[in-house]
Swiss-Prot record:
Keyword tags: Amidation, Cytolysis, Disulfide bond, Knottin, Membrane, Neurotoxin, Secreted, Signal, Target cell membrane, Target membrane, Toxin
Assembly with partners or alone: Heterodimer of A and B chains; disulfide-linked. Interacts with CSTX-1 (AC P81694), and with CSTX-9 (AC P58604).
GO terms, molecular function: toxin activity
Stated name of the protein: Toxin CSTX-12
Disulphide linkage map: 50-65, 57-74, 64-95, 76-93
Keyword Cell cycle: no
Family designation: Belongs to the neurotoxin 19 (CSTX) family. 12 subfamily.
């Protein structure tokens, strides 16, 4: 019983978090009208200008694509701390997804298959 309660709370937290991000995107537009909903959703689904996972996002850190549930985050690091070359001193950023979010996403996909089938 405890496991079911914990799983239910986890699922509700994830679902509310993903829907809250979508609502925040809607609220950012100052002139939001009902006619603007369809073009907004089309832009979010297509979004060809986003940076794919594990690709360079150094120049535009807010351009990472969105997976099915969560948005990827631009994480920066230095390639090598040992050498004094110019390349080692340059910061490198790539779009990545946290491992716990990846596991949650895969788990929910498997749960959907289990419930549906």
């Amino acid at each position: 019983m405890k496991v079911l309660v914990i799983c239910a709370v986890l699922f509700l937290t994830i679902f509310s978090n993903s829907s809250a991000e979508t609502e925040d995107d809607f609220l950012e537009d100052e002139s939001f009208e009902a006619d603007d909903v369809i073009p907004f959703l089309a832009r979010e689904q297509v979004r060809s200008d986003c940076t794919l996972r594990n690709h360079d996002c150094t120049d535009d850190r807010h351009s990472c694509c969105r997976s099915k549930m969560f948005k990827d985050v631009c994480k920066c690091f230095y390639p090598s701390q040992r050498s004094d070359t110019a390349r080692a001193k340059k910061e490198l950023c790539t779009c990545q997804q946290d491992k716990h979010l990846k596991f949650i996403e895969k788990g929910l996909q498997k749960a959907k298959v289990l419930v549906a089938g």
